[in-house]
């Protein structure tokens, strides 16, 4: 049987590439989206309202969770709250949906985006996942988000956080923001 993935954040730069690569390799990829789609493999969810179409989880082996408000916007007090809540709440909605499934029907793995913004800005040190995080807004967001993510281990899932750095690429990421300055 072909492995099946569920992706959140599939409309973003990283998510769309992951979806494309998995599909090219013959994997079935379901996508959770907050916007309706005619694609039969796209399912609706609304983390703010604790809503998730449970059909999205049917026969899923691995969830790749990339959803969250972009950090590439002005950080007003209100938007900082959205950055944090979008990550915590979407992760919580996923975990609660998974926990409602019979144990033998739960995904085996949860891969979540995280960020290197956890670590202090020190050009003379190489950090590992064993190093403590820094201070500041991003470090706080990442600490709270990863705490929420790792609660899914209690569901018998393998959990992995990918601490991603700055992403450069055509058609997205920070490169589009920086190019006008050059």
Question: Model regions: which residues?
Answer:
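N-terminal Rossmann NAD(P)H-binding glycine-rich loop of SDR-like oxidoreductase domains
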Residues: 4-25
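SDR active-site strand-loop-helix element
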Residues: 8, 32, 63-67, 110-116, ...
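Conserved glycine-rich Rossmann-like NAD(P)H-binding loop of the short-chain dehydrogenase/reductase
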Residues: 27-34
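NAD(P)H-binding glycine-rich loop region in Rossmannoid oxidoreductase-like domains
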Residues: 37, 44-91
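Glycine-rich NAD(P)-binding loop of the Rossmann-fold in SDR/ketoreductase-type enzymes
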Residues: 82-90, 133-136, 140, 144
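Conserved Rossmann-fold NAD(P)-dependent oxidoreductase catalytic core, especially the SDR/UDP-sugar
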Residues: 92-136
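Active-site Tyr-X1-5-Lys
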Residues: 135-159
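NAD(P)-dependent short-chain dehydrogenase/reductase
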Residues: 153-160, 165-182
């Amino acid at each position: 049987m072909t492995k099946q993935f569920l992706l959140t954040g599939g409309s973003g730069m990283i998510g769309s590439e992951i979806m494309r690569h998995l599909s090219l390799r013959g994997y079935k990829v379901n996508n959770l989206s907050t916007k309706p789609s005619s694609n039969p493999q796209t399912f609706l969810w609304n983390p703010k309202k604790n809503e998730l179409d449970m059909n999205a989880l049917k026969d899923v082996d691995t969830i790749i969770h990339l959803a969250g408000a972009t950090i590439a916007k002005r950080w007003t007090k209100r938007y900082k709250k959205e950055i944090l809540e979008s990550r915590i709440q979407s992760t919580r909605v996923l975990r609660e949906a998974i926990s409602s499934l019979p144990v033998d029907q739960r995904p085996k793995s949860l891969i979540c985006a995280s960020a290197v913004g956890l670590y202090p800005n020190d050009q003379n040190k190489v950090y590992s996942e064993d190093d403590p995080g820094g201070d500041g807004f991003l470090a706080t967001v990442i600490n709270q988000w990863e705490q929420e993510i790792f609660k899914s281990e209690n569901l018998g899932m393998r959990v992995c956080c990918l601490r991603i750095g700055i992403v450069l690429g055509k058609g997205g990421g920070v490169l589009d923001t920086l190019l006008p300055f050059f």
